[in-house]
Amino acid sequence: MAAAGGSAGLRGEGEMIPILILLLAILIVVGLIVGLRINAFVALIIAAITVSLLAPGDWGEKIVRVAQAFGSTAGSIGIVIAMAAVIGVTMMASGAADRIVQAFIGLLGRERGGPALTTSGFVLSIPVFFDTVFYLLIPLARSMFTQTGKDYLKYVVAIAAGAAATHALVPPTPGPLVIAANLSIDLGLLILIGALVALPASTLGLLYAGWLNRKMPVPMRDVPGVKSDPEPLPQLPGLGVAVIPIVLPVVLIAGKTIFLPLLEAESFIANTATILGDPNMALILAAIASVTLYIHIRRPSRTCLGELLEQSLMSGGLIILITAAGGTFGAMLQAADIGPAISNLFAGSAQSSGLVMLLLGFCMASLLKFAQGSSTVAMITASAMLAAMIPAGGLGFNVVYLGTAIGSGSLVGSWMNDSGFWIYAKMSGLTEVETLKSWSALLVILGVTGGLITLVLTFLLPLA
């Protein structure tokens, strides 16, 4: 009996050491980013090295494996993020983004300005960063108010409802891309499920926009540098070619996910689908299409084209570094045997263990968002940690739902340390209190709705 008790004690002690390493790692990341305002890349690398030094393994390999994990992660997502940045910048420069917005306004009409702005934000925020989308659409909200004399707050919140949801849930925006890489989620599946979760969340956000506008009408105020009408462009591309940079990668990646299992293995069609549906190739082709459209419409000089591409790649460079550091951090947590320790703490059926992981992913992303302000950093860090905790027996449902739980959680907790908070407030002319009641509350609604839809889908469509 004594021997059995001693064995149990040793087993418990062995399980607690990885948990303590995890807690120390969280403390380092949050302390450096929030307390000392250290760049997320530096904080994650320091945390990864610390975890690697404490984890089992030969001392000669402890730093080497950090560098190897960094290279592996950068190799898996570097091209995709760089190409996504090129697509976003060139779509704005060519007028393709403006053309898509005009199409939604024309289809739904200015009398349905709220749904038109939500739909525009929803679609454009898939390839374009949120702040750029908001900057593009806010003049339309002001123009609609000038024409109707009402519903300004509804238009502003409607933009955020669409743009914020896909920013956190649908690749190829950086956060969802990293979630897919860290959790080894099929990118096409995350596009489909992410959009499925984001759509009803955005719809509820639009309803909240209408309700809040009635309860708290806000006048349109003058904002320096923001016009009340969209900036006219000399020429816009046709709608058919304007949507190619968005539609092409979605069709190629999702098409591979859907149709490849139905094709004969090693056939010409299957091999072609495998190549074209690879996320790297799909985003490269989409970037080529977007750059070609920009050249055709704007006829830039080689110098202007080079500067535009350099600008887009520089914007993606820091994201690649932070993403690779997050993947390195997750790999070192795996080396510290965090996963088996967490599995033993929540021993039971795969389904109950999976539900605990969903809740953990949502809450961890929310806490990180609240602590340091960035949804992207919250998604990178939370997915890296959760990747090391997935039970060996699986979750009882597809890991894609853990990804949408993390993405949903990263929306909750936006306040004055979030750059998005200030972009929304300053460009719309709202006060801090009005922003808390509209922006911060909206993101709670989007995040909680996304989390609940994710939970329901694990039962209705587990995809296990």
Predicted regions and their residues:
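Long, contiguous bundles of hydrophobic transmembrane helices that form the permeation core
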Residues: 2-19, 192-307, 462-464
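Alpha-helical transmembrane segments of multi-pass membrane proteins
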Residues: 81, 110-126, 148-168, 186-199, ...
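Hydrophobic core segments of alpha-helical transmembrane domains in multi-pass membrane transport
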Residues: 22-33, 45-53, 81-88, 121-124, ...
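Hydrophobic transmembrane alpha-helices of multi-pass solute/ion transporters
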Residues: 12-86, 99, 103-107, 252-325, ...
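Membrane-core helix-loop-helix motifs of multi-pass transport proteins
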Residues: 4, 143-250, 398, 420-457
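C-terminal transmembrane helix pair
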Residues: 111, 198, 354-464
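Membrane-embedded alpha-helical segments and adjacent helix-loop junctions characteristic
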Residues: 59-144, 299-390
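Structural signature of hydrophobic alpha-helical transmembrane segments
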Residues: 15-22, 75-77, 132-133, 280-281, ...
